[in-house]
């Protein structure tokens, strides 16, 4: 030990012995400059303190807490250790502040910034904070809590941890907001923005908060809740989580709105727009909300409701959900109006137009609205799928558990008439009305569109009857203009005839198919269409004769009426049917053809199998077994000889003796004897 170091050490030891003779102190002070301050050690504590910074913040340790602070900045503040703490301070800077250690506490503090804030540790807590920024905020830890705090920003806000809580806080921005943790909670917040909002965690809650924006809003977590919050925008709104709720919101916009979650709810909202609206979730509700617009409206979800909201526009409407309702809302237009769902309602709204109307849903309702619908409120459990493709569509109100799908077809009452034309046209279905009938004619055919009144149901198909009607008009003279359908005389006369038929036959009359005029005064030849079964030929003639006065009103003096009904062959009669014997013959032919096909298949299979298998010769020529043959007596079994083989079996080998005698040789025995 050099004399320059030994002298201050001995001086410190003497001062400790003089101050408290009953205590045993060990103090090592290392100084590399002049004008060192006093470093007293009390009550048997060991306090090697290291100070290398000027005016660093105070880091006290109280009540058996473990707080190893390290100071490496200029003008470091006091670092006392109390209640049996152990604080080895080391001083390596000029004008370092006093570092007392009291009552066996351990408080190593590390400070690497100028004018850093105080980091106290109380009541047996473990708080190794590290400060690497200028004017960082206070990070106190109380009541046996564990709070490793890292501060790397200027003027960061306070991050206190109380009552046995664990709060590792990381601050890397200027003027970040406070992040307190209370009552055994775990709150590792991270702040990397300027003036970030407060992120407190209370009552055993877990709240890892990450802030990377300027002036972000508060994100408190209360009563055992879990609230990991990430803020990456300026002035983001508050995201509190209360009563055991889980709320990991992420904010990446400027001045985003509040997203609170209460009473065991789960609310991970994501905000990526400016000035987003509030999205609160109450009473165990689940609310994943994504906001990507500016000035979006409020989307609250109270008691146990589930809501997914996606907004990609500016100024979207409110979508509140109450009492366990499910409302996924998608908005892609400017300034849509409110879409509320109440009391267990399900409301899916897709809007792609501007100025959408209000769509509230109450009491378990389900509604789907697409593209600029007008107001469609549904109350008391009704189901109303409404689709609108225009702006400002009409209102559809449905109450009392009704289910309604409406299709509007504007139809007006009254009659429909067309001006007679002299050009032939194609006939179309006639018009039907409950209040009046329509009868128009052309030279060849008149097309009448059906018009249904509000009191008559539309008919898809109407049976019709055609009548050939001819009569004479003796108060008119025939001229060449009646042969031209475009002439005024032709049009006037045809219009009068049609009006007469309409007045006489009323609703039974459907129209005139063809009409022509010829000479004889004026002879009218027409094909008239009536409703099927309404009239017959005799009734048509009698009614025309009875309404001669009505004919005079149309300037028609009719006579010589002839009516004949046209008979059209039906579809069944147009194609003659097959007689029964023909059908029977056809079935028989089909059966015979099927049997022939089966027989041919079986025959082919038999031929193939016969070619694959060999022939079985029961008495072959070279067989050795023939009861009455000239072969030797002992040859009792035949041997199989493959075709084309001249080698005989060794059991059939015969050796000649004196010329006529035959002997049988057993090759196995012969081989065995030779081997022996």
From Swiss-Prot:
Extracellular side: 26-582
Lineage of the organism: Eukaryota, Metazoa, Chordata, Craniata, Vertebrata
Record motif Required for interaction with AP1S2, residues: 664-667
Name of a matching Pfam family: SEA
Name of the protein: Mucin-1
Record-level GO cellular component terms: apical plasma membrane; cytoplasm; nucleus
Entries under SUPFAM superfamilies matching the protein: SEA domain (SSF82671)
Sugar-modified residues: 43, 45-46, 50-52, 56, 58-59, 291, 323, 350, 380, 400, 413, 435, 479, 496, 536
Region (Required for interaction with GSK3B): 645-652
Residue positions, PTM Phosphothreonine: 646
13 X approximate tandem repeats of P-V-H-S-G-S-S-A-P-P-T-S-S-A-V-N-S-A-T-T: annotated span: 40-314
